């Protein structure tokens, strides 16, 4: 320990990086954190993990705490579309890598999956099964992944010549409650959608629970697909068709990028690393077989 302290004093570094996520209980972010930790441990760095709960105020408060602790870098899953977090970190010369989400701030590294392309592939899969009345349940309009996944949904519909119905686009939080709440709304409209695209795993799980509780048969009466795969213990019958993101690799690459810059490895001024997702087709998506009903069976 004394040697480690001496090294920190000489280098003026704490050998600590921070990972700021929206919700560490989401298995997607848990896997990202593991990738970050493994990469950091290999270079004798420690990792601090904090949760924002998608609150921009909480995000700023935590960043101030991390600045006071003099972390050597921040890996940030932005809670919104504000440039304030980046101005704050830049004022203290703390470098940042954006993880999972797209930002418009210049000179900021990004590591993420292609949300628009992944969403497009899921909706295109549903269209290929004959669905034309496809709904989407997504997160806040202020979050880039929500915006990009809706854009992919809209592009798939447009290319297939399917008119966009604003009533089939439902915004909420990336949460179990949000998925359940918005699915209940979709079940109340007539005609119902024949398929639903959930833009993250929490929304998907909440939506699936709402369907099962309403007695709606998946996929016979309604297909359901999700961006982000569900962990093994969450799966229920039927297992969900999903766009699986390489979460561990996203975390590992983001940490490596930050640590290589700290080590002085020559790199471009800005790097945007976009990793492909994998479409996994399971039993929750099927062809249109019956007309959607306005109310479930008793």
Where do the PLM segments sit?
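Negatively charged, flexible loop motifs adjacent to catalytic sites
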Residues: 55, 82-83, 104, 227
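Active-site-adjacent beta->alpha loops and helix N-cap segments on the catalytic face
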Residues: 81-91
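Amphipathic coiled-coil/heptad-repeat helices and related helical stalk/stem segments
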Residues: 2, 58-59, 82, 119, ...
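Flexible glycine-/small-residue-rich
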Residues: 21, 78, 100
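Short beta->alpha connector loops
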Residues: 53-56, 77-82, 202
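Amphipathic helical "hinge" segments at domain boundaries
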Residues: 2-73, 140, 151-154, 158, ...
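Bacterial carbohydrate/catabolite-sensing allosteric modules
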Residues: 35-46, 67, 90-98, 102-298
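Redox-cofactor binding/interface segments in oxidoreductases and associated redox assembly factors
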Residues: 19, 76, 198
